[in-house]
Design a protein with these regions (language model features):
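Generic beta-sheet signal
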Residues: 47, 59-61, 80, 124, ...
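Active-site/ligand-binding-proximal alpha/beta "capping" segment
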Residues: 169-193
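Short, polar loop motifs at secondary-structure junctions
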Residues: 29, 46-51, 83-84, 172-173
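Short loop/helix-cap segments at secondary-structure boundaries that form the rim of catalytic
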Residues: 49-56, 86-90, 181
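Hydrophobic alpha-helical segments and helix pairs
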Residues: 64-102
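Boundary-proximal intrinsically disordered activation/regulatory segments immediately upstream
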Residues: 3-48, 127-128
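RNA substrate-binding interface of SAM-dependent RNA methyltransferases
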Residues: 88-175
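Active-site regions of enzymes building and remodeling cell-envelope glycoconjugates
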Residues: 53-64, 185-187
Length: 193
């Protein structure tokens, strides 16, 4: 059973498996703590033998932790987390991301969005995988405190507009200054790569 469980956990490093299972791995004390706070932590994986026998804790050897971890020198703790529902929940301040490909950029954008009070993020299908280890690390836990959906923007934007959300996009050509835009209660901002 143990070997099978480890094999299944290693498979979570693969996007296809993450999508099929609705699960993903996070590395390190901070990320595990943030996942727990958000109620998304299903299983803690640790090399700390003093945790043996605790509920929802799997104690593994250092060599197994190295197989599971994304980093060369893993921290002694990881977690298996479940993905949130892919449903729009908040309409007051929405950040729409169109084609963001760089994992570090996506993570930084998500951290900034949380800092600026956004609760809802919409990602186009061609954005980098949200559960890519580099994205998760660069969010520093912000990913656990945002509602994030992946959907076709040609469906989402008209739906938001029907709900009275003003949609504002960045553009290099024929654009108005951000200073000229009047703030409304419901706004969505579109950013590209």
């Amino acid at each position: 059973v143990y070997k099978r469980q480890i094999k299944d956990l290693v498979k979570l490093k693969n996007k296809k498996t993450r999508d099929e299972k609705g699960l993903f791995l996070v590395d390190g004390f901070h990320m595990v703590e943030e996942a727990k706070k958000a109620g998304l932590c299903d299983l803690v994986i640790s090399t700390d033998e003093s945790l043996e026998g605790q509920d929802k804790v799997l104690v593994v050897s250092d060599s197994v932790m190295e197989k599971l971890s994304y980093t060369k020198t893993p921290q002694p703790i990881m977690a298996v987390c479940h993905k949130k529902d892919n449903i729009l929940k908040h309409y007051d301040r929405v950040l729409i991301l169109d084609g963001v490909q760089d994992p570090g950029n996506l993570g930084t954008i998500l951290r900034s969005a949380l800092a600026f009070g956004f609760k809802q993020i919409v990602m186009s299908p061609d954005c980098v995988d949200l559960y890519n280890d580099k994205v998760l690390r660069s969010t520093q836990g912000a990913v656990f405190h945002l509602d994030i959906v992946r959907d076709d923007l040609s469906h989402v934007i008209p739906e938001l507009q029907k709900l009275g959300v003003r949609v504002i996009a960045t553009s290099l050509h024929n654009a108005s200054s951000i200073d000229d835009i009047k703030s409304t209660d419901k706004m969505a901002f579109v950013m590209g790569n």
